[in-house]
Design a protein with these regions (language model features):
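Helicase motor interdomain insertion/brace
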Residues: 1-259, 294
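Conserved catalytic network of the ASCE P-loop NTPase/AAA+ motor domain
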Residues: 218-221, 245, 270, 274-283, ...
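Structural motif
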Residues: 227-229, 290, 308
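Conserved RecA-like helicase motor core of SF1/SF2 enzymes
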Residues: 257-258, 293-318
Length: 318
């Protein structure tokens, strides 16, 4: 029963898979090639296994603080790299844009480390939490959270990070590590850059997965409300921008960055949220809402006609 007393019945749920072939010029067609998987599984990911690069021959010169840092590296060495690799694979399944953005961020952070090593500057290491690894970045860091910052020189990003040190950053002198750390960083960076060069610049017009979503919204369900779930805010924001650019009206995205995602739920589903709308106020209604799991629990979205899981990891039970 709705808040106004009107009764309703839930429609029968019909799961319809949406298959699409990759267009010949779609960069995603190259991303699902074995070459991509070989690089992902072949990367050393040294920033997430720093314990293996500690120069233990110099242990007698370590300060008490450095001994504690090394102990932390040793405790964290087992799972961090595996989580990062898994996250990259999940981003690949989400879409080419999110995947290439993660690769670019990874390169940028490697370059920041290399800049520090080559200039004898302290390395910004941090606490790695599972929640960070499963979020939009392989590690949530202020240096390259903003997509625009990816084009900054490593020296600029290093200076910005040094001037605004997050609480989770621990600065470590480069002499604490062996030369192999630099070699591994260079090897991973070169391998990723080769992939990015192969893919070329991301072009929305060649994104066949996006094209299939547009077809579903415009042709298959032109008059229906469409709710799209994705695990990543990068994908959500990308899709919202691409749909608007294509000319689809009344589109928005809800992510963890929104201060009040409930307002987006109300705009998308005003009928089922009528009790939350002040008397006499109108609602700028949405037809298409793209959301991360920020709206997966505790929100009324019953005005939706079509629910799309853009990437597989979304949990239907939520």
């Amino acid at each position: 029963t709705f808040a106004n007393g009107e009764r309703f019945t839930f429609p029968e749920r019909v799961a319809v898979p949406v298959d699409h072939p990759f267009a010949a010029d779609d960069p995603a067609a190259l991303m699902v090639d074995n070459m991509t998987l070989d690089v992902l599984f072949g990367m050393v990911l040294p920033r997430y296994s720093l314990s293996g690069y500690v120069d233990r021959a110099k242990a007698k010169s370590w300060t008490t603080k450095e001994k504690e840092i090394v102990e932390h590296f040793d405790r964290a060495r087992s799972n961090a790299a595996a989580f990062v690799r898994t996250t990259l694979l999940k981003r690949l399944s989400s879409g080419g844009y999110a995947f290439t953005l993660s690769l670019r961020r990874h390169v940028a952070r490697n370059e920041l480390f290399l800049h520090a090593i080559d200039n004898g500057l302290a390395l910004p290491t941090g606490t790695i939490q599972e929640s960070d690894l499963l979020d939009d970045d392989d590690l949530v860091e202020h240096d390259v959270d903003d997509v625009e910052r990816l084009n900054d020189a490593a020296a600029q990003r290093y200076e910005a990070l040094a001037n605004d040190t997050p609480d989770y950053i621990t600065w470590v002198r480069p002499d604490l590590f062996t030369r192999e750390l630099r070699a591994s960083l260079v090897a991973d960076t070169d391998a990723i850059r080769a992939l990015l060069s192969l893919y070329g610049d991301w072009d929305t017009s060649r994104d066949s997965k996006l094209a299939e979503l547009i077809k579903l919204i415009e042709d298959t369900h032109p008059a229906d409300k469409v709710l799209v779930f994705t695990e990543y805010k990068d994908t959500a924001n990308y899709l919202a921008g691409a749909l608007r650019a294509h000319g689809i009206a009344k589109v928005d995205a809800a992510t963890g960055d929104d201060k009040d995602p409930t307002q987006l739920a109300i705009r998308f589903s005003p009928k089922s949220n009528v009790s939350l709308i002040p008397d006499g106020e109108s609602v700028d209604e949405l037809r298409v809402l793209i959301s991360t799991d920020v709206l997966s629990e505790g929100q009324n979205l019953q005005d939706a006609h079509i629910v799309v899981n853009y990437d597989l990891p979304w949990a239907i039970v939520r």
